């Protein structure tokens, strides 16, 4: 069965926040996933990472793989904003740690990305510290999905992509656990689109061709960031 919200925030303690940038030149943003109610650096949440396609510019995955822990919230943005978002995330975590009496000398911010250059002037690097802080301030259990935050500039199956989320509740013995997922979708050719088990892509492609829509011939390329969260008692190797 699905969780109460059918979202990653059905996992206890997880929050999601967005900041969306929509201007004449830029259609982009940032999404933050806060893994729990406590200081992530102090708690070092059990974590793992998996790279399906290595043509990406994500930050922080190497240490997650090495140590099996997550010590910051996760941020998603566009490709050329990874550095600026990393810097903002580091600053926010340092502030949180100092407020909790900690003085970190090394921090591993985790930032994922998709390239949204098709509808966003990505070279402008429109996401900075202000936008990251706004995303943190907006973090909640009841977050928006679709054309928001890091999904503002993404394209999926030749149509508008965005942020999506879902959850499932499973039973092991007499105890219930929740698995939640959040995606930033930016991939796929229209002809391969399947909705609720039905291959609707070819029909959409035919309609686009009738309308002389040039986007109908897009190649199957792009990327997707997938963030999974769970309250299952697993090790980093089991998560992998």
Show which residues each predicted segment covers:
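A structural signal for small-residue-enriched, beta-sheet-centric alpha/beta enzyme cores
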Residues: 1-240
